[in-house]
């Protein structure tokens, strides 16, 4: 699998990178880097792609990925109108940032195990994220040795918190970047933002391949059929809209690229193991719990 390779360069006197990103959208190409990455979404919503996983994200989302895991966060323009911009905190660190024998120490066995699991991507549920975020924010405030100690403290805490894996398997990309794949993905995302269909023939033309050759290429590159990838992305968009609005389900289905409500309900049930209405109600229960004194 080929993706854009990102080179991570810590600043002077630093062994790892911290970044805060603010703007109307998050739109990065599929990329990889040898460093582990911890990403917290302070505000904003969209779709995240970790290995072969496609899921919606919203404020509070906390994900840890291992080195060389293909990933991509996307907020589409139509999802980012108004004052709610995306705010994201990212920490990128080498597993050997404390020395190559660090993870072999018995005191950090749980951390080592967690970083191995992170090769498939790890999502921390809301309760876990809420417990970890204060330490993450502390990390961004510290300097020097205190900054390093804050990262160690954060990783130790995360190793004890509930989490779930995202990708069905660990995916190892090829070293060479593939701009052709990113061109196709940008086309897909633009079309979904406009609510327009994406014919396979047009995607194939963007990649300068015949439809048959493109189908083989896309499946080899993403481990998904083209139609399955597009469907999962549309379902991810629909899930995000269901969670944060009371608009009619049929309207959300149409906006997300499903022009038959029965087909949308069936696809959503197969993907999320619940109906769109039940999915929306599950988020309402969470909101009510948070609103309770």
Task: Please state what every model-predicted region is.
Residues 1-63, 290-293:
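Generic protein-terminus/edge-of-domain signal
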Residues 6-10, 69-138:
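A hydrophobic/aromatic-rich effector-binding and dimerization subdomain
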Residues 47, 54, 197, 246-247, ...:
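Residue at a beta-strand N-cap/secondary-structure junction
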Residues 56-73, 151-158:
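Conserved long hydrophobic alpha-helices within structured protein cores
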Residues 108, 114-120, 126-173, 179:
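An amphipathic alpha-helical interaction segment
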Residues 138-146, 159-167, 176, 183-199, ...:
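Basic, amphipathic alpha-helical hairpins
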Residues 172-175, 189-190, 196-236, 253-282:
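Basic/polar phosphate-binding segments, predominantly the helix-turn-helix DNA-binding elements
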């Amino acid at each position: 699998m080929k993706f854009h390779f990102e080179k991570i360069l810590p600043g002077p006197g630093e062994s790892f990178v911290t970044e805060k990103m603010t703007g109307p959208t998050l739109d990065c190409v599929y990329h990889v880097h040898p460093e582990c990455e911890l990403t917290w979404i302070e505000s904003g919503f969209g779709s995240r792609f970790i290995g072969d996983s496609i899921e919606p994200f919203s404020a509070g989302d906390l994900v840890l990925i291992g080195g060389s895991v293909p990933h991509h966060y996307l907020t589409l323009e139509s999802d980012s109108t108004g004052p709610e911009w995306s705010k994201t905190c990212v920490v990128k660190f080498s597993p050997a940032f404390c020395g190559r024998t660090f993870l072999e120490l018995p005191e950090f066995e749980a951390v080592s195990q967690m970083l191995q699991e992170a090769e498939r991507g790890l999502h921390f549920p809301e309760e876990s994220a809420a417990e970890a975020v204060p330490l993450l924010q502390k990390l961004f405030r510290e300097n020097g040795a205190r900054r390093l100690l804050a990262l160690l403290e954060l990783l130790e805490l995360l190793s004890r918190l509930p989490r779930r894996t995202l990708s069905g398997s660990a995916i190892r990309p090829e070293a060479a970047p593939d701009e052709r794949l990113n061109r196709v993905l940008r086309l897909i995302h633009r079309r979904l933002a406009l609510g327009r269909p994406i014919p396979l023939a047009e995607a194939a033309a963007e990649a300068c391949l015949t439809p048959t050759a493109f189908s083989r290429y896309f499946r080899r590159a993403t481990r998904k059929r083209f139609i399955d990838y597009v469907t999962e992305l549309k379902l991810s968009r629909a899930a995000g809209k269901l969670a944060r609005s009371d608009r009619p389900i049929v309207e959300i289905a149409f906006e997300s690229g499903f022009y038959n409500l029965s087909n949308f309900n069936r696809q959503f049930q197969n993907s999320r193991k619940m109906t769109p209405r039940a999915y929306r109600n599950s988020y309402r229960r969470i909101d009510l719990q948070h609103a309770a004194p």
